[in-house]
Amino acid sequence: ACGTKDQPVGDVIAGNLCRCTGYGPILDAGNAVPVSARDDGDTIALLQGLRREQPLTIHSHDPETGVDRHWLTPRSIEQLADMLVAHPTARVIAGGTDIGLWVTKKLDRPEALIWIGDVAELNTIREDRNNLVIGAGVRYSDAHAALARLHPDLGELVRRIGGLQVRNAGTIGGNIANGSPIGDMPPALIALGAELTLRHGDRHRTMPLEDFFITYGRQDRVPGEFVESVRIPRPDPNSRIAITKLSKRFDSDISAVCAAIALHFDGDVVRDARLAFGGMAGIPAR
């Protein structure tokens, strides 16, 4: 069937709007479709072969506005840092799930775009006994398993972010850096006590994630600075965590409110409580 053990048919058709027969026949039809294994190795090898040895740089001049525009593709985190120092107002783009809408809906025309998909240092996931560290360029689909191991509610939250195509493109770092008040990940990460690492040139700084959001549309990031990674502490056995997303539709919809609660118990006594919310103000907060 078109659904598999790792990807149920319900996930495949997530966001489908049915206005006639109901979802039962759609699910039945999906489960009845035979699926044979597909080898994409040759296609992937061909696409990887198109990658250039040197970073692809495109410069153009807009004669109507007199503006020079740049497309830059660093291959290392050092190149990225240098490019952002040289172009401090550049937009960093990973999956483009937000910036694409800014261009098509708001008619935004950034002077410089820096694509980070080939920066290996931003595409790492590190786990140890105490922390999970996710690079800013890691896509939701790639982070899903590690987040689900951290706590099942985190895995379920990620599964409800957009559709599969969005999760295959969008990144957790982008969800944080863009500062949307209805971003799904920040409330959960704030409740868990996550910390953010930022970089400007060769300088790093770390802050609690909740301090990154100042007010609507404004984050604690100077021009030329970028999000490098987010560190999520591993919950201890005495913690209880619950994460809930409310939206008009279950799948592929923005949050009306996203709530995350982390309680630390000492026996039957709550010693610490962290409650974080998104969608209720100009920034996610606790």
Label for each model-derived stretch:
Residues 1-286:
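C-terminal structural segment of proteins
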